[in-house]
Every structure is written in C-alpha cells, then in structure tokens.
Amino acid sequence: MMTVRDPRFPSSSTTAIQSDAAIKFCDTTLRDGEQAPGVAFTAAEKLAIAAALDAIGVHQIEAGIPAMGVTERDVLREILATDPHADIVGWCRADHRDVEAAASCGLVTAHLTIPVSDLHLKSKLGRDRAWARLRVRDCVADATDRGMRVSVGFEDASRADDAFVTDLAGELRELGVTRLRWADTVGLLDPVSAHDRLGRLVRAVPGPWEIHAHDDFGLATANTIAAVQAGFTWVSTTVLGLGERAGNAPIEEVAMALRHLLKLPVDLDTTSFRSLARLVSRAARRPLPAGKAVVGESVFAHESGIHVHGILRHPATYEPFDPAEVGGRRRLAIGKHSGRASVRYALEQYG
C-alpha cells in the first residue's frame, strides 16, 4: 500500500439547508449500543468510551439505565465524577422507580420513554393511550419536581397514530419537557415518507425534536438525514451503529452526511472517528469491517487502474471527502486490477 497527499476537495452540488446552528448529537452507544446481543462493556470500557465521546464534542451522552442495578448506577456516578463537558443522561422508562434510580445517581438529566403505538401498549403492557398519557405526565412531573431536566421518547412512533403523538407532544411541551424523541423502533421508515411525516410533526409542534432511527432495513442514516431535512435538530446515534438487532444510525455516517451532503455545520472532532471506532469495536468484541462506511480500513484504498489514475490526478474523482477528516489516509494497492499508473507510481515511491 502507498499513500498519496490530499489536495483540496471540491464541494458537492447538494443544496445546503439554511441554518447556522449545528445539529446536536445524543450518542447512545453506552445504552442502546450495549443492548446489542453479546455486548457487555466493563466499567473501565464505559468510562473510556464516555471520555472519548466527550473529547470529540458529543453534546449529550446517554450513558446507561439507572434502574438496571447498583453496578450500572455506580458507573454512571463515575462518569459524572469526571466532570465531562457533555450532558450525561440516564435512560428511564416512564416509571417512578426509574426516576428515583436516576436521581439517586446525581443525574440532572433524565430521558423518559413511553410506548405510543397501540401494538406496544396493548400487546406488551396491556394498556391503552389514556394510560400512556397519564403515566408519562406523572413521571415528567416527578422528575421536574426533583430538579431534573427531562426529555421524552416516543417508543415505536413509526407505528403510532400521528394525531395521538402530536397531541401528546403538545401537552409535554407545555409541561416544560426539553426535547422530544421520535423513535423508529424497528426501522420501518423510508426517507421520503419520513421527510413528509416528520415535517408535519415539526410544524404542528415546534421545538427541539430528536430522531432515533434503527437500521433493520439499512436506512437508519438515510432516515436520520431526512428527519434533519424535515426540521429535527437532534440526532440519536451510536458508534459504528452498534445497537439492538441491526443497530442504530452510526455517528460517523450521520456526521459526515450532515457536513458534506446537507452542508450543515458539525461541531464534532471528526478526525478522531477512526480511533473512536477502534475503541468501541474492541470493547464490543466485534471486528471492524474493512468496508465500513467512513471508518473502515479499506474505504480510502484503491486498486483499480482507472480509479488510481483518477486519484493521482485529483483524489476527489473517486473520494467524497478528504480521508484526514475522519483520521484516515488514502492508500493505493498493487494487485490484479492495477494499471500502469499504479505501477509507475509505486516504482517512483520506491525509487
């Protein structure tokens, strides 16, 4: 493999969204990411991942589930003791016991989740919409009475009645909830319908909205971007898309798509994405695929003669952005598909 230097990359032709404010990231690697089958971070690994997320400038870290038990609460306290710049949030069910557990850790921010689809309410809990409305209002009041900031997540919103979600969202805004999370719990959204549907929601209930997308159909990043185009200002992500079933929207993909496709400011240190990905990959005991978008070892490697010829003339011919932006480097490989340009360049490099 050989490296070549990076010239300036031209901007893509995509029309920019007119906004000076950077989209906010709530990273849930330590909560939803750890819920991936077979993943169980040690306390030391959780602390290291939290520190790495804080170092790159993530705005909010969903660091765990206080109600899970003493060990989880102890780790949350340890993370808080590092005095991070990021807001540390505990994930809670709409349950007074969960609120109490979060408060006992010293958390000042709690995220309460409530199912909003009839499928979840009836099949999982044996409840109805009236119960959900009352339950979440009571728990919001409990948390705010304790001096906590509260966000609320609508579980399985993609299969819920939009009118019910809209009405409940309006009520929660009036109660002072800081942000509302719309969860595509089993990844059923598509980007076109997501843009239309979520746009109507933002217009009906203005204020901060967060998209929490799952990747069951491989559309988590696309749906997250569509939500931002529709007016959502927060995105829920995990490193490498680690999460339940097929996972979540990867922070590295979402950040670079916001920057290069939507032309929005991204105030994260993206140059640390490669090292962050390796850290989480090791902690999760899951190999980092060579072709993983944005951070894989091979995503800036070129062997085809036609491609190498173009890269040597101008790297933007076959790359969407400078590899250095994510802590990567360009590499040219000599192999079956190499052309004269590759061989000539290799000979020049080695004298």
Swiss-Prot record:
SUPFAM superfamilies the record matches: Aldolase
Catalyzed reactions: acetyl-CoA + 2-oxoglutarate + H2O = (2R)-homocitrate + CoA + H(+)
Recorded coiled-coil stretches: none
Single GO MF descriptor: homocitrate synthase activity
Domain Pyruvate carboxyltransferase residue range list: 23-272
GO biological process, one term: biosynthetic process
Enzyme Commission number(s) from the entry: 2.3.3.14
Keywords: Nitrogen fixation, Transferase
InterPro entries according to UniProt: AIPM/Hcit_synth_CS, Aldolase_TIM, LeuA/HCS_post-cat, NifV/FrbC, PYR_CT
Top-rank taxon: Bacteria
Enzyme class: transferase
Family: Belongs to the alpha-IPM synthase/homocitrate synthase family.
Primary role: This protein is a Fe-Mo-cofactor biosynthetic component.
Protein name (database record): Homocitrate synthase
Encoding gene (name): nifV
